[in-house]
Amino acid sequence: MTIFEALRHDHDTQRELIDKLIETSGDTKTRHALLEKLKHELQEHAKFEERYFYDPLIFKDLTQEKARHSIAEHHDIDELIEELESTDMSSPAWLATAKKLHHKVHHHLDEEEQEVFQLAGRALSDKQKHDLAQKYDANMH
């Protein structure tokens, strides 16, 4: 398995969770549980993705700009989650913020897979791609 396959697997989980979250309504146990699960998944993924994927990329000219941009998007996503947690789940404002988060997560994941992965594929050796996947997977799962 390469780092790209490992990350893509978790991206699929994140897409599924955020898609389910915006289909919920009201201040329900389901909505609370999905938000907590999504928050945990996104935070853990960002932590280990930054450590085992973006850290080696930030020092390479080819990938430095994209790595910094993606890390900044992780922080934007964290802020939207904080906003959701401080908003009444039954209010229209909560759903509006959840939809912003949905858009941001999908945009971020698509951009990583379509742009960052291609550049990283050229910047990392085959050995690095496999070694980083093992380290990421061992910590994430």
What are these regions (language model features)?
Residues M1-H141:
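Small-residue-biased structural context
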